[in-house]
UniProtKB/Swiss-Prot annotation:
Pathway: Amino-acid biosynthesis; L-arginine biosynthesis; N(2)-acetyl-L-ornithine from L-glutamate: step 4/4. Homodimer. This is Acetylornithine aminotransferase. It comes from the Archaea. The lineage of its organism: Archaea, Methanobacteriati, Methanobacteriota, Methanomada group, Methanopyri. Its EC number is 2.6.1.11. Its cofactor is pyridoxal 5'-phosphate. The modification N6-(pyridoxal phosphate)lysine is found at K245. It catalyses: N(2)-acetyl-L-ornithine + 2-oxoglutarate = N-acetyl-L-glutamate 5-semialdehyde + L-glutamate.
C-alpha cells in the first residue's frame, strides 16, 4: 500500500486532500512520489515562510536534536530563553512577555484565558469571517457555521460582528466584555483586508472602554504582509498577539505575546503546555526569526507581492476580485466549482494553490520564492483562470 492508501485506511477522515503525495522539498519547490515538480504557492498553508528545508532551520534542528530534544517546563532551557528574547525584541515596545505552545489554536486559547484572568470579564467580540482555530475556545471565536455547529454548545459569550465595522463593535460592548479578537487580514475568509484605519479605531475603542485588543497574527505574521506583524501597517500596539505557522520555519510551534502588565495576570499553574517551548521547537524559532529579520524578508514579501498583483491583474477581467497584502493574496473567482477546477488544473501546470472560503484561490508562497518562480507560477494561474472563464 502506498501513502495515500495507508492514510485513507488508518487516518481519521478530517481532511480533503489533493491526490498528490509530496516527498522532498527545497526552497519554493516540492516533488511528488512520481517525480513531478511543483512551485509551491501554498507553503503548508502559510507555514513555510523560509521555503522547504531552509539550511538555517535544518542546521539548527540537527544540532539541537543531538543535544536536547525535550525537558518540560520544570526546568529552564537555553533555546527557549533565546527564542523568547528574539520575539520580544522583534515585537513593538511593551509586547515583551512570551508563552510558547505548539500551534495557532493553542496560542488563541492562551490569549482567551489571559484576557479573562486580567480583566475578570467573560465576553469576547469577534468578527464575521474570522478564523482562530478548531479547539473549543478558539472555535468559539471562529465564525464559520460549518465549523461551529456540529460542536455546539461552545464557550458562551462570543459575539460576532461584521468585519471592519467599528460601530458594530461599539454596540456589542457591555460591562462584561473582556476583549476584541481580530485578524489584521482574514485568511480563511478569503484574504480579506479591512478598511484603512480599522485597527487604529479598534485600539481607540478598546482604550475608551477598558478592553483588551487581541490580534491574531497566526497566518499574517512573520513578515508575510510586508511587516513582521501585519498590525504594524497601522502602527497599532495590541495587548496580546497570537503567532504560529511560520514561527518555526516548518517546525510546529506557536506563541502568545503580551504586554507585561497583562501577562502578569498569569501565575504558576494558570496555564501551561508540556511540549510548549521545548528545546527542539525553540531552536527552530531562533533560526526562523533570525533569518526573517536578517534577510529583511518582510521587505521582500512587500516587493514580491507587488509583482504578483501586477501579474494577477492580467486576469482581473475573468474573476471577481484580486486582493492581497505582501505575499498573502486571494483571487475571488465567483464560483466554488470553478475555483476547485482551477486548483486541480494548476497541479498539471506545475504549481500548488489552494481554495478557501469556497471560491477564493489563496496564494501564500514562501517569502524566499524567487521572482522568476513567482512569475512562472502566476502566469500559469492567470492562463488557467482565463481558460476557465
Amino acid at each position: 500500500m502506498d501513502a495515500r492508501e495507508l492514510i485513507d485506511k488508518y487516518h481519521m477522515n478530517t481532511y480533503s486532500r489533493f491526490p498528490v503525495t509530496l516527498v522532498p522539498g527545497e526552497g519554493a519547490r516540492v516533488w511528488d512520489d512520481e517525480g513531478n515538480e511543483y512551485i509551491d504557492l501554498v507553503a503548508g498553508i502559510a507555514v513555510n515562510v523560509l521555503g522547504h528545508c531552509h539550511p538555517a532551520v535544518v542546521e539548527a534542528v540537527k544540532e539541537q536534536v543531538e543535544r536536547l530534544i525535550h525537558c518540560s517546563n520544570l526546568y529552564y532551557n537555553e533555546p527557549q530563553a533565546e527564542a523568547a528574547r528574539l520575539l520580544a525584541e522583534a515585537a513593538p515596545k511593551d509586547l515583551n512577555k512570551v508563552f510558547f505552545c505548539n500551534s495557532g489554536t493553542e496560542s488563541v486559547e492562551c490569549a482567551i484565558k489571559l484576557a479573562r484572568k486580567f480583566t475578570g470579564c467573560t465576553k469576547f467580540i469577534a468578527f464575521e469571517g474570522g478564523f482562530h482555530g478548531r479547539t473549543m475556545g478558539a472555535l468559539s471565536a471562529t465564525w464559520k457555521p460549518e465549523f461551529r455547529e456540529p460542536f455546539e454548545p461552545l464557550v458562551p459569550e462570543f459575539e460576532h460582528v461584521p468585519y471592519g465595522d467599528v460601530n458594530a463593535v461599539e454596540k456589542a460592548i457591555d460591562d462584561d466584555t473582556a476583549a476584541v479578537i481580530v485578524e489584521p487580514v482574514q485568511g480563511e475568509a478569503g484574504v480579506r483586508i479591512p478598511p484603512e484605519g480599522f485597527l487604529r479605531e479598534l485600539r481607540e475603542l478598546c482604550d475608551e472602554h477598558g478592553l483588551l485588543l487581541i490580534v491574531d497574527e497566526v497566518q499574517s505574521g512573520m513578515g508575510r504582509t510586508g511587516q513582521f506583524f501585519a498590525f504594524e501597517h497601522e502602527d497599532v500596539l495590541p495587548d496580546i498577539v497570537c503567532l504560529a505557522k511560520g514561527l518555526g520555519g516548518g517546525v510546529p510551534v506557536g506563541a502568545t505575546i503580551a504586554r507585561e502588565e497583562v501577562a502578569e495576570a498569569f501565575e504558576p499553574g494558570d496555564h501551561g503546555s508540556t511540549f510548549g517551548g521545548n528545546p527542539l521547537a525553540c531552536a527552530a524559532v531562533c533560526a526562523a526569526v533570525s533569518t526573517v529579520l536578517e534577510e529583511n524578508l518582510p521587505e521582500a514579501a512587500e516587493r514580491k507581492g507587488k509583482l504578483a498583483m501586477r501579474i494577477l491583474s492580467e486576469a482581473e477581467d475573468v474573476v471577481e476580485e484580486v486582493r492581497g497584502r505582501g505575499l498573502m493574496m486571494g483571487v475571488e473567482v465567483g464560483d466554488d466549482e470553478r475555483a476547485k477546477d482551477v486548483a486541480r488544473e494548476m497541479l498539471d501546470r506545475g504549481a500548488l494553490v489552494n481554495v478557501t472560503s469556497g471560491d477564493v484561490i489563496r496564494l501564500v508562497p514562501p517569502l524566499v520564492i524567487g521572482e522568476d518562480e513567482l512569475e512562472k507560477a502566476l502566469a500559469e494561474l492567470a492562463d488557467a483562470l482565463r481558460a476557465s472563464g
